[in-house]
Amino acid sequence: RQRQMCIRDRPMQGLKEFEDLEAALPKLSGVIQISGCIDAAKPHMMYSIGNGSGNRIIVTFQEQKAKELAEEYRFFDPNVAYYPAKDILFYQSDIRGNVLTAERINALKMMAEKRSCTIVTTFDGLMNPMPSPDQFISAVRKVAVGDVIDLEQFTRHLAELGYEKNYQVQTSGEFSVRGGIIDIFPLTEENPFRIELWDDEVDSIRSFDAESQRSIENLDEVHIYPACELVLTKEERDAGIARILAEAKQVSEKLRGEMKTEEAYRAKSAADQVAE
């Protein structure tokens, strides 16, 4: 790899131990253990070793440690993202808030857009299934002023991307349609944006404040990233829901036959909630 020299590298470059390490790394293969570095210096050490090597991934043992490491590493490299694992215990709360999903989508976006970035995660996060780069990039929808849009098809596509339709956009992951005005709040953006149509042609695009509804900036084009990691078509989603409901019905009936009415109710309720 070709090192990109930076002023932040200089403290490390002056250390004989670091220079010896750099000289040895190209000759080594497999898992390499480096010891003797205090915790406070680890982000600097990792940055200095990995700088100029394309995309990098840092894996640590615990979520809180990963968050702290991402924040500390950001001092050396602004193109860093924290990728949280999918926590089953807090799955329902994240459905409502989209906080963890937004962090994962932002990490995927960074990998798709940046030539060089650093992702910080845990072993659990590393084992999470995720879409291939081609699948993720192909799901991104670009809209530019002058484009022709089929409104019905476009809103159906937003639903497939994981966006929830609402009367008025208030939080990320929502969209609304009022006549020829489409409001969308991507998980990857700080503010929603408004697409105004003249008949079926995009007349204008601008970002706006979700609370005041005031316009912020006119835009020539926008990229709409998915609001979920697994993008399904309506047909795939309907087939999956039908299968879940059918299996839940079988489980519920079996539990009722065993006089386990409470467990049967919970199984059916969980399936109904997923279907909604």
Sequence positions of predicted segments:
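ASCE RecA-like P-loop NTPase motor cores
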Residues: 8-276
